[in-house]
From Swiss-Prot:
NCBIfam families given in the database record: cobS, PRK00235.1-5
Cofactor: Mg(2+)
Enzymatic class: transferase
Record-given protein name: Adenosylcobinamide-GDP ribazoletransferase
Membrane topology annotation: Multi-pass membrane protein
Lineage: Bacteria, Pseudomonadati, Pseudomonadota, Gammaproteobacteria, Pseudomonadales
A molecular-function term among this protein's GO annotations: cobalamin 5'-phosphate synthase activity
Natural source organism: Pseudomonas entomophila (strain L48)
Residue ranges of the TM segments: 31-51, 55-75, 109-129, 134-154, 188-208
Keyword Transmembrane: yes
Amino acid sequence: MLPFWIALQFLSSLPVRLPGMPTPNEMGRSLLFYPVVGLLFGLLLWLASHLLQGAPAPLHAALLLALWVLLSGALHLDGLADSADAWLGGFGDRERTLQIMKDPRSGPIAVVVLVLVLLLKFCALWVLVERGTGGWLVLAPVVGRAAMLGLFMGTPYVRKGGLGAALAEHLPRRAAGWVLLGSVLGCVVLGGSPGLWMLLLSLGVFLWLRRLMCKRLGGTTGDTAGAMVELLELAVLVGLALMV
């Protein structure tokens, strides 16, 4: 179970303590549990939504979004901000794009992108809450983190050394394929027909984002992987909100 605790510590702000420094093999296996962490987030959001029944829909949605950000420690939002700055500031140049991603400061483009993504998530949550489909909240965190597993499974990691390189190098790919299949089937069971359409939409967004990464960088980084999580969660929420 150590790989699960590694995944939970890395992807969440929950107080998880590991018994020692994980080995590279344990780090790679932790990727297999990313969809499980997404499922945990989704269940916590669903429980919170159930407890907030009766609250005004805008406040209900805002509190869910705040909990969502707190659970992840804004980890993927940080990656989205860095990627937005780098993508527009890099002017198509690979090395310049990678250099800007290392800058901890956020420019106006990053701020605008974050505001837009959070605003769209809030509006989508509002619709889902108002129409009594809060149970579908489980789907978005699962899809986002399963996509990260899929990205590391089939995309080169462009930075040598560090956490991301260890994850990509030591990921057991056959097991990862089974985990992805289980995640897809689970989303279909939970979401029914809308869940299936949502998966097709997510696949399209995933392939498009991966193509952009490979064209610009020749692969992925931790920041672009985080950006993918946020954008896929957004696609799922908006897609479901439009279907209900």
